[in-house]
């Protein structure tokens, strides 16, 4: 048996944590500017329990949220607000891809898992450095950020009515057991909440590799009076559909394994008069 095999899970976790701390110290000392973080040092279980208590900080209302630490290069006085949100962004493949595509728009990835959100935070810092010193890109990744948060509880603390133009739900936890279906990210109640945040003619995007979950999400959104499902032609002509299909880590994994991806997108229609 190898030495690695003999190590306990706790020992491996401690070693990985020490390695992460070392990298962070080097980064602060200027030793690894522009170096992308190693994903293996930020591994965590695929999903988190949204009903568990997490040590999270959130404002009492959207007006009390200070976004300047997240978007330090944007003029706070201009009152620019987050418009695109990647819910459960994971390691940030889509969040990062959206940045150059919408360089004048603030994009936010929201992720409940601490290790994963820490990874994306460091990745964004490295990408910003590279954009400034090596490979310029539109927006320089200064318009993207990540926030560790439970999106099924605290979105009203961050976003106002009609603030968002796009919301993405990419490869969410399928919660296979029937008793867990109430914890799914798309429900009738949550669909109404999302309709509150998305402005008229904004878009809600979903993608999953689990057909049963795809049917569930589509049924709930189809039934909602404020959402209209995209036609296939509309999906094919939307660059964001291409990005969420090809740029997310889960999407790439599904492609490598030869799996299927199920997409459903919805326009937020105006409130009836």
Curated annotation (Swiss-Prot):
Location of this chain's protein in the cell: Nucleus
Pathway field: tRNA modification; N(7)-methylguanine-tRNA biosynthesis
Catalytic activity field: guanosine(46) in tRNA + S-adenosyl-L-methionine = N(7)-methylguanosine(46) in tRNA + S-adenosyl-L-homocysteine
Assembly with partners or alone: Forms a complex with trm82.
Described purpose of this protein according to its UniProt entry: Catalyzes the formation of N(7)-methylguanine at position 46 (m7G46) in tRNA.
PANTHER family tied to this protein: 3-DEOXY-D-MANNO-OCTULOSONIC-ACID TRANSFERASE/TRNA GUANINE-N 7 - -METHYLTRANSFERASE, TRNA (GUANINE-N(7)-)-METHYLTRANSFERASE
Name of protein: tRNA (guanine-N(7)-)-methyltransferase
Lineage per the UniProt record: Eukaryota, Fungi, Dikarya, Ascomycota, Taphrinomycotina
């Amino acid at each position: 048996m190898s030495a690695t095999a003999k190590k306990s899970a706790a020992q491996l976790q401690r070693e990985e944590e020490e390695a992460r701390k070392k990298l962070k110290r080097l980064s602060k000392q200027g030793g690894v500017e522009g170096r992308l973080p190693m994903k293996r040092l930020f591994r965590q279980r695929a999903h988190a329990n949204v009903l568990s208590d997490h040590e999270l900080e959130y404002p009492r209302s959207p007006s009390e949220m200070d976004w300047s630490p997240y978007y330090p290069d944007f003029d706070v006085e201009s009152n620019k607000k987050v418009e695109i949100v990647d819910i459960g962004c994971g390691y940030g493949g889509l969040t990062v891809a959206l940045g150059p595509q919408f360089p004048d728009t603030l994009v936010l990835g929201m992720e409940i898992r601490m290790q994963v959100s820490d990874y994306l935070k460091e990745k964004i810092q490295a990408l910003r450095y590279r954009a400034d010193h090596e490979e310029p890109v539109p927006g320089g990744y200064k318009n993207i950020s990540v926030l560790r948060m439970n999106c099924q509880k605290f979105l009203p603390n961050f976003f106002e009515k009609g603030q968002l133009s796009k919301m993405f739900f990419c490869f969410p936890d399928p919660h296979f057991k029937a008793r867990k279906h109430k914890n799914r990210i798309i429900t009738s109640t949550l669909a109404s909440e999302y309709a509150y945040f998305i402005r008229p003619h904004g878009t809600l995007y979903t993608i999953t590799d689990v057909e049963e979950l795809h049917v569930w999400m589509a049924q709930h959104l189809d039934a909602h009076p404020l959402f209209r499902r995209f036609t296939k032609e509309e999906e094919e002509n939307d660059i964001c559909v291409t990005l969420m299909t090809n740029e997310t880590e889960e999407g790439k994994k599904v492609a490598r394994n030869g799996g299927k991806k199920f997409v459903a997108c919805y326009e937020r229609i105006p409130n009836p008069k």
